[in-house]
Regions:
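Surface-exposed loop/turn segments flanking beta-strands in extracellular/periplasmic regions
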Residues: 284-295, 340-358, 408, 643-648
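Short helix/loop capping segments that flank catalytic or ligand/cofactor-binding pockets
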Residues: 190, 273-275, 327, 336-339, ...
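Exposed, low-structure sequence patches enriched in small/polar residues
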Residues: 28-29, 201-208, 247, 309-317, ...
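Aromatic- and glycine-enriched pocket-lining scaffold segments that form the walls
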Residues: 308-356, 365-367, 371-375
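Outer membrane beta-barrel
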Residues: 240-299, 303-336, 456-472, 619-634
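Compositionally biased linear targeting/interaction segments
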Residues: 27, 45-237, 243-254, 258, ...
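Bacterial Sec-dependent N-terminal signal peptides
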Residues: 1-49, 718-721
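Residue-level recognition of beta-strand termini and adjacent short loop/turns
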Residues: 96, 107-110, 137-140, 220, ...
Length: 721
């Protein structure tokens, strides 16, 4: 409008003036006006405020493409951390390199380019300037915009506080949040009917309601503490050792600004390197694994409701100005385990976190687990080394019944593992790896080589070998098998941006299992996974994507009382188109699946779905989802992301014939209070019951309602970051 006003004044002046201008002068004025118009438009384009996509679009674009029947592990704590960061975005002009490196979709070159640009320009004027950062492609910009904001001045050395606060201030001057969610099923499962002859396994002790309460406190990145209580559906309340709920989890984190130490008390997570000792430092996504970023050992609070994968105790980190860092922790937990009849030996671990039947309650916290670890690292800009050791002692011997596939599984009371990880950064290359050895000398190793020949292209290769007898109880690397052992493989990945707003990415993963597995009774079975995705964005409001996935794996086949192996192959194709405006967004998606076996079995499945969101006002928003699916059987099942309440995540598998719908309403009657309601309905056309055994529903309908209340106390002046 301002430019239009200026141009109009110039034209009126020229028309009213008696001065005669030459044709050459008129051309110059015309060129000036055109260039001014282009410049103003560029400035307004750069000053685009707000994220380029919503949280739901990020989950559907980045996470859900990697979730299928393969069962890749999605770290719930990291997913929840990303969701909370999306709700409280980092200030891009004050965030540090460590903050940006925590995002799994960014590589170090992109982070360095962003920081260099910020230093030269004395800060970002808006998120639109991300398009001027070298190496920052369209989708990286969109993903990052979900978690950062631009509403503060640039500070050269990071955040500086003019007020000296005591530790007590860190623990009291921040923001408080209380959240409660109640899930109500509008149906009845078989397990809630007490049979005439009750036993320890044929009915649920509690009611069908699921309830979770969360309390969270945070003071920027410097302090945090929280408490989580959860009751799963079917679990009792205030009886049989539940006070009042089954699951309690709390944590305290203190990491004062400009201090070189941090401390964690209570429940915490450990992530390190490539995951041969502890969980991998990021999501276990093969497409993202090609980014080639080394993430050293880190502690983080356990904030999710996952009742199995965490430590409980004390963790401490201390770093020096010369790049040295020391980490140490000690943990003690009571695990769910199935014991022998005399109770002196554990036979298996129960990791579902469910305690609904008497037999599940009997297994609750029956095995003590003491874990300690120490590590030292030297991290420089061009290279780094890290040495970590972990010791675990069970209170009772662990010995699972012998089967053909578990002869090399852990047995005993004590396990000890040590790992050495490294990274090297030659020009245009990124090399990292990890070697781990257990107390018996069995080795596992994983190495990654990435090469970037321009900001538009990146290729990577990863090689792994896990000894069949290697034991690491907390390892979680990227693999096709269910544990970090008995596997060798190679992964090749590619990421290419041929033209602006177009991205092609994919990988090929080959694996061989040295010893028999649960699914393949013959040694040296093989598996191949392939993935190819193309994404195109014509503008900031419309995107088109296509993804193809191939999964081929050998399984046991019994022919004439003789065991052999057969390949079972699954092809999946997904096409999606998304529209996004300031107050609404919509995604139309089509999925297809073809499942075949070597003996001639063939199954087909397809699904069409629509997901949308609408911000009616600043206080009311509506999200919806509807899908129609037809599959021949469960092996041709398909997946789709549905709108979820905050801090909840699940991937719905669609099989057989039916329709599914979800409606989610969020209302803020006052600034600090948010009320949310989620209703879902699933209808099968070719079934008169759903699920089996104690979870059986004697109906073709499955309807659920969830209510969530969230109250947030705003941060005080000195609690902002």
């Amino acid at each position: 409008m301002f430019l239009f006003f200026v141009c109009r004044m110039i034209v009126l002046f020229l028309c009213s003036s008696n001065t005669k201008l030459s044709k050459k002068s008129m051309k110059r004025i015309f060129v000036i006006i055109v260039w001014a118009w282009l410049g103003i438009n560029a400035i307004y384009a750069q000053r685009f405020e707000g994220p380029f996509m919503s949280w739901d679009e990020f989950v559907a674009s980045y996470l859900d493409n990697e979730v299928d029947d393969e069962g890749l592990f999605i770290d719930e704590d990291m997913r929840e951390w990303l969701e909370r960061t999306a709700e409280h975005p980092l200030q891009i002009n004050r965030t540090t390199k460590a903050d940006l490196m925590a995002f799994p979709f960014l590589n170090e070159q992109q982070v360095d380019s962003l920081l260099v640009y910020r230093a030269k320009r004395r800060g970002f004027g808006s998120l639109g300037e991300l398009q001027l950062v070298s190496g920052m492609d369209y989708y990286s910009r969109c993903f990052l915009s979900v978690f950062v904001r631009c509403d503060s001045a640039y500070v050269e050395d990071g955040y500086k506080s003019d007020i000296r606060l005591r530790i007590s201030d860190f623990l009291s001057e921040g923001s408080h949040e209380v959240e409660s969610r109640l899930d109500v099923p509008l149906y009845k499962r078989k397990g809630y009917d007490v049979p005439a002859k009750p036993s320890a396994t044929n009915y649920y002790v509690g009611n069908p309601l699921h309830h979770i309460v969360r309390y969270r406190y945070r003071y920027g990145k410097e302090a945090a503490y929280g408490l989580t209580m959860e009751k799963d559906a079917g679990e009792p309340v205030a009886k049989r050792g539940f006070y009042p709920y089954d699951y309690w989890s709390g944590y305290v984190m203190l990491r004062p600004f400009k201090k070189r130490w941090s401390i964690f008390l209570g429940d915490f997570q450990i992530r390190a390197a490539n995951g041969l000792l502890y969980g991998k430092g990021g999501f276990l996504l093969r497409a993202a694994n090609g980014i080639g970023t080394y993430r050293p050992l880190t502690f983080s609070p356990h904030t999710s409701s996952d009742e199995s994968h965490y430590f409980r105790g004390l963790a401490y980190s201390q770093s020096t100005a010369k790049g040295w860092k020391i980490n140490a922790f000690v943990s003690h937990r009571r695990l769910d385990a199935r014991l022998t009849s005399n109770g002196d030996t554990a036979q298996s671990l129960q990791q579902t976190g469910l305690h609904r039947t008497l037999s599940e309650i009997e297994m609750r916290r029956s095995l003590g687990s003491f874990t300690s670890g120490v590590g030292v690292s030297m991290l420089r800009s061009k290279w780094g080394l890290e040495l970590n050791e972990c010791l675990n002692v069970y209170s009772k011997p662990y010995s699972s019944p012998h089967r053909y596939y578990n002869e090399d599984y852990f047995r005993g009371r004590t396990s000890s593992t040590m790992s050495l990880s490294y990274y090297v950064r030659p020009k245009n290359f990124f090399i990292n790896g990890e070697c781990a050895v257990d107390k018996r000398g069995y080795l596992s190793t994983l190495h990654h080589v990435g090469y970037t020949w321009s900001h538009r292209s990146h290729v990577a290769m990863e090689m792994r070998y896990f000894s069949p007898k290697y034991v690491s109880l907390y390892a979680s690397p990227l693999q096709q098998g269910s544990r970090a052992a008995n596997e060798m493989g190679v992964t090749m990945s590619l990421r290419y941006v041929p033209v602006r707003n177009v991205e092609v990415s994919g990988y090929v993963d080959w694996a061989e299992f040295i010893r028999p597995t649960f699914q393949a009774a013959i040694p040296h079975s093989k598996g191949v996974n392939c993935f190819l995705q193309t994404q195109y964005a014509s503008s900031s409001s419309w995107t088109l994507s296509m993804a193809y996935r191939l999964r081929s794996k050998q399984y046991t086949l019994n022919l004439d009382e003789k065991k052999t192996l057969e390949y079972r192959i699954t092809h999946k194709l997904r096409m999606a188109s998304s529209w996004s405006k300031k107050r609404w967004n919509a995604t139309v998606q089509a999925d297809a699946c073809l499942y075949t076996t070597q003996i001639g079995e063939r199954q087909v499945g397809w699904m069409c779905s629509v997901r949308s969101g609408w911000s009616v006002s600043s206080k009311l928003s509506v999200k919806g989802f509807v899908a129609c699916f037809f599959t021949d059987d469960y092996d041709s099942r398909l997946y789709a992301y549905q709108p979820q309440l905050p801090r909840s995540y699940s991937m719905q598998a669609f099989a057989d014939h039916g329709v599914d719908g979800v409606v989610l309403l969020s209302w803020c009657p006052v600034e600090k209070l948010t009320l949310s309601l989620r209703a879902s309905s699933l209808k099968y056309f070719n079934r008169d019951s759903i699920s089996s055994r104690l979870d059986r529903i004697s109906s073709s309908w499955k309807n659920d309602v969830s209510v969530q209340v969230r109250w947030v106390m705003k941060e005080r002046k000195h609690g902002k970051y």
